[in-house]
């Protein structure tokens, strides 16, 4: 974990303007899964996930819980996708580190991504 944290430190130093960021937006994947687990959402519902605000305390709680569970136990969490059960801990470790280091108290969950932005810009 300390090797990953060192790498994250390096990446954050290289991102222009990262220190001045005021809002953390997390896209899909780990962040959406963490939100679903926090909500207790067994069946995916984009409307409940999109724009959900995950507090740092919730992120750390979900991380601690998942990190102490076996794969089988992780799969019992409402919202945990089978394909994500093996990789979620790494993604959560990154999210926790970024939130702590950058001082974010919450992460805004977005189910939109760069492709949505590209389509919207072409329609404008």
Cite the ranges covered by each PLM segment.
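Helical "lid/coupling" subdomains associated with nucleotide-phosphate turnover
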Residues: 1-124
